[in-house]
């Protein structure tokens, strides 16, 4: 009697009947086909992001697969005087420290929200790189990064806080001449060895009216110290490390 009544209850209960009828049906379409880009609505949660909808296992793997990032190596720094380089065979090589110093200078110009990479930024780049003999030479003479930053803001002023620098702030004319001077120093020495941060610093110092030269002079850098650094850089086997 009890078994008979429970059977009647199952047949008369609409919820159980619906569940039972649904379980007997077979889906003719794969479950992941029902993935949709539309937002789902829920009376309690409001709009539910479509990312919660079911997706194909294959597409999920493709989505989670890390993207390949192609990196290009920088082989040289910009020059405004291509006549300095006659052919690829004679093209001087920039050391990795010089290239990193240049990249750090660009980044510092962006941090300060300046529209260009000037000699002051190249100077800060040498100090930020930090491992070269030139950067150690500057610090030994009490020319520190924070001091150069302070003098830069005093000399050039603060940039507009709402201004966004380009990804690669273009070089100012004096910064370009400083890099060309660094390149020229290497060529005058016979093009032997690499162009190093020491050559960049000497190029900055050669631009007397540039912000970088003025900041160096304010912090105690002199022609005597420039000649001292030049004597080190001209030695055979000097690697600026």
Curated annotation (Swiss-Prot):
Domain observations: The MYFF motif is functionally important for stabilization of the overall ClpPR complex.
Domain of life, source organism: Eukaryota
Gene3D superfamilies found in the cross-reference section: Clp, N-terminal domain
Protein name, as recorded: ATP-dependent Clp protease ATP-binding subunit CLPT2, chloroplastic
Span list, region Repeat 1: 94-159
A Pfam entry, by short name: Clp_N
GO terms for cellular component: chloroplast; chloroplast envelope; chloroplast stroma; cytosol; plastid stroma
Organism: Arabidopsis thaliana
Cell compartment(s), UniProt: Plastid, Chloroplast
Function: Accessory protein regulating the assembly of the plastidial Clp protease system. CLPT1 first binds to the heptameric P-ring containing the CLP3-6 subunits followed by CLPT2, and only then does the P-ring combine with the R-ring composed of the clpP1 and CLPR1-4 subunits. Once the core complex is fully assembled, it then associates to the CLPC chaperone partner to form the functional protease. CLPT2 and CLPT1 are partially redundant.
Gene: CLPT2
Disruption phenotype: No visible phenotype. Clpt1 and clpt2 double mutants show delayed development, reduced plant growth, and virescent, serrated leaves. Clpt1 and clpt2 double mutants are seedling lethal under autotrophic conditions.
Presequence range in chain numbering: 1-75
One GO MF term: protein histidine kinase binding
Keyword Disulfide bond applies: no
Subunit structure: Monomer and homodimer. The dimers monomerize before association to the P-ring. Component of the chloroplastic Clp protease core complex which consist of at least 16 proteins: CLPP4 (3 copies), CLPP5 (3 copies), CLPR4 (2 copies), ClpP1 (1 copy), CLPP6 (1 copy), CLPR2 (1 copy), CLPT1 (1 copy), CLPT2 (1 copy) and 3 copies of CLPP3 and/or CLPR1 and/or CLPR3. Interacts with AHK2. Interacts with CPN21. No interactions with CLPS1.
Cystine pairs: none
């Amino acid at each position: 009697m009890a078994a008979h009544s429970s059977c009647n209850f199952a047949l008369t209960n609409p919820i159980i009947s619906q569940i039972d009828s649904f379980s007997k049906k077979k889906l003719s379409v794969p479950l992941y086909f029902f993935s949709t880009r539309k937002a789902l609505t829920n009376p309690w949660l409001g709009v539910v992001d479509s990312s919660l909808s079911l997706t194909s296992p294959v597409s999920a793997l493709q989505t989670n697969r890390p993207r390949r990032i192609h990196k290009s190596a920088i082989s040289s720094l910009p020059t405004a005087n291509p006549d300095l380089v006659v052919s690829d065979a004679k093209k001087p090589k920039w050391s990795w420290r010089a290239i990193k110093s240049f990249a750090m200078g660009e980044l510092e110009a962006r941090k300060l929200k300046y529209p260009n990479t000037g000699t002051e930024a190249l100077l800060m780049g040498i100090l930020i790189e930090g491992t070269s003999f030139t950067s150690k030479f500057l610090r030994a003479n009490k020319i520190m990064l924070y001091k150069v930053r302070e003098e830069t803001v005093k000399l050039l002023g603060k940039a507009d806080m709402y201004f966004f620098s380009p990804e690669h702030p273009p070089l100012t004319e004096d910064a370009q001449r400083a890099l060309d001077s660094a390149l020229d120093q290497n060529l005058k020495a016979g093009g032997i060895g690499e162009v190093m941060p020491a050559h960049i610093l000497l190029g900055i110092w050669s631009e007397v009216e540039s912000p970088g030269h003025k900041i160096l002079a304010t912090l105690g850098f002199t022609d005597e110290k420039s000649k001292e650094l030049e004597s080190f850089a001209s030695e055979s086997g000097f690697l600026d490390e």
